[in-house]
Amino acid sequence: MNVTIIGGSGLIGTKLAPLLERAGHRVTPASPSQGVNTLTGEGLAQALAGADVVVDVSNSPSFEEQAVMQFFRTSTANLLAAEQAAGVRHHVALSVVGADRLADSGYMRAKVAQEALITGGKVPYTIVRATQFFEFLRAIAGDGAAPRVSSALFQPMAADDVAQFLASVVPQDPRNGIVEVGGPQRLPMNEAVQRAFDAHGDARRVVADAQALYFGSLLNDRSLVTSAGAQFDAITLDAWLANAGTPGAR
């Protein structure tokens, strides 16, 4: 298959491309640094020429509420129109577990808007909702000396396993629906962040706070965990911290 990866220079895109190539697919990475801009449409037609499948793992460069909404609405609309013109047979999009449960978050509302464009479009699709990545655990806490982090349960996973799951979806028939994938463990967010701090030599102590916000939203124990029927990866947080070293090393 010919596969175009939108967001091909990012964390997931750079992990996904070699997996697809080893499986025998022809891969075209596409991102602004490679001359493809989904916001303006620049380079899209060329990047999608001959593509059977498009995998969209792109992300907004800004998390500001209006900017992130504009990014996902505009880029997704442009991408779907270009795919239809190019005869793409399967649109695979990476989204977020819990996006539809966190209406107070501008970022999550933008992801829901992206999903709505896909489900309302004419290109057959599969939406993959994944949980938060191990690689971003420390970023959740920010730079404070004693960061306050939600004590709600969540279910993080390795970016490598997100890429592996996406690679398994590519050759399948479009589901025209949503599938969820998450880590093998549910644990309090503050505990996961503290483990990441400890493993990386960060001496800060995380303060568990049930009122701490996540992307602008208050969490409960169902907000960020997978639903019934979800897929699960096998790498636990402790195993990832022991083997990955610094984020991005895997």
Task: List the predicted regions and their residue ranges.
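Conserved beta-loop-beta element that borders a ligand/cofactor-binding pocket
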Residues: 87-90, 95-101, 113-136
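Glycine/proline-rich active-site loop of Rossmann-fold NAD(P)-dependent oxidoreductases
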Residues: 135-144, 169-179, 202-204
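A conserved pocket-lining segment of Rossmann-fold NAD(P)-dependent short-chain dehydrogenase/reductase
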Residues: 125-126, 139-157, 161
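NAD(P)H-binding glycine-rich loop region in Rossmannoid oxidoreductase-like domains
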Residues: 22-86, 97-103
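Substrate-binding strand-loop-helix patch
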Residues: 153-160, 181-195
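N-terminal Rossmann NAD(P)H-binding glycine-rich loop of SDR-like oxidoreductase domains
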Residues: 1-23
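Mobile cap/lid helix-loop segments that border enzyme active or cofactor-binding sites
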Residues: 193-250
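Rossmann-fold NAD(P)-dependent oxidoreductase module
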Residues: 15, 19, 82, 117, ...
